[in-house]
Amino acid sequence: AVLRSPLDRIGYGGYLKLASNWPGFIDEIQNVVGEFRQIHENMQGTKSYVAPFKVAILNCWGHQRKWMSNQVHHSIYHRETYSAEGVLECLSGMPFDVEFINFDDVRSGIPKDIGVIINVGDAYTAFSGAENWIDEKVVTAIRKFVDEGGGFIGVGEPTACQHQGRYFQLSDVMGVDR
């Protein structure tokens, strides 16, 4: 991830106790910063390989609140984001540009540069989409997207909203229902 999006600075979240209790900590951070600066210099502004398509994370917020897909503090358990944390961590180091889209984006037409849509979260939450999945425009747009070669990945309870005898509204696409 650091090679794909180089850092200009490193912060350690206000853990001043690290500096006071372990004097060698500052020296080690200085060494790490030096290594990153060397990587920047060696890269000479070149970009790393990126897949020819984007991966989209689909939730109720989309780009407006992309930070809502995860929580900032990694050591505190958040039930609502548990499913998504591993997905976002994996994507951060992979050769994909990631875009966050919402259901209005899907209704308006899935952007042509998106090759995979990921829907992650618990049922009936803004993370997975809740009642958006009973909107025929949404499910039709994603079925068409997959039919034309796009990928759809679900984690947790994707597309979940009990409706017309189905729990996962795209069970036909995913090959599984609850």
Name the predicted role of every residue range:
Residues 16-18, 61-64, 123-125, 158-162:
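Solvent-exposed loop/turn segments at secondary-structure junctions
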Residues 12-15, 100, 119:
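Conserved beta-strand positions
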Residues 88-110:
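A short, well-structured beta->alpha microelement
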Residues 5-9, 51-53, 94-99, 112-116, ...:
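Loop/turn elements at helix/coil->beta-strand transitions in domains of secreted/extracellular proteins
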Residues 1-80:
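Hydrophobic targeting/anchoring helices
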Residues 17-22, 104-109, 131-132, 160-162:
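Acidic-and-aromatic substrate-binding clefts and catalytic sites of carbohydrate-active enzymes
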Residues 109-131:
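Short, well-ordered secondary-structure micro-motifs within conserved domains or adaptor modules
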Residues 129-178:
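A glycine-rich, often tryptophan-bearing local segment used as a flexible ligand/cofactor-contacting loop or short
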